């Protein structure tokens, strides 16, 4: 296997693209297409955003097949945890989980929902 690309369905690619750029502290750019955008850093793909219902991908046909966020967790390992936390707090009204140390990994983490849930 060469590389894993995580693709998530979103309602508005441009809005979600800007939201994830803000969260991850990436420089602002525009997605390449209205229906698809790839977030990259240092030559690595971090996340692909795909508009629901485009390109006939069965798992991305409709968000109505499952509740938003059901079965999907995205963990981003960052070098700037405190800065990422500060950015996250500007993007949501409240975190889903406040910062804490994960007992399994021994790393600090917090949880929030993106614009699509």
Where are these regions (language model features)?
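Conserved active-site tyrosine of GNAT-family acetyltransferases
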Residues: 16-21, 88, 117
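Vicinal oxygen chelate
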Residues: 1-5, 26-77, 83-113
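Helix N-cap motif at beta-to-alpha junctions
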Residues: 12-13, 79-81
């Amino acid at each position: 296997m060469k590389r894993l690309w995580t693709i998530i369905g979103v309602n508005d690619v441009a809005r979600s693209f800007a939201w994830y750029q803000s969260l991850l502290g990436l420089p602002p750019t525009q997605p390449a297409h209205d229906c698809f955008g790839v977030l990259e850093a240092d030559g690595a793909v971090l996340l692909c955003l795909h508009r629901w219902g485009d390109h006939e991908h069965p798992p991305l046909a409709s968000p109505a097949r499952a509740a938003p966020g059901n079965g999907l967790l995205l963990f981003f390992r960052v070098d700037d945890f405190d800065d990422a936390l500060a950015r996250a707090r500007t993007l949501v009204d409240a975190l889903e989980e406040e910062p804490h140390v994960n007992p399994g990994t021994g790393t600090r983490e917090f949880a929030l929902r993106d614009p699509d849930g």
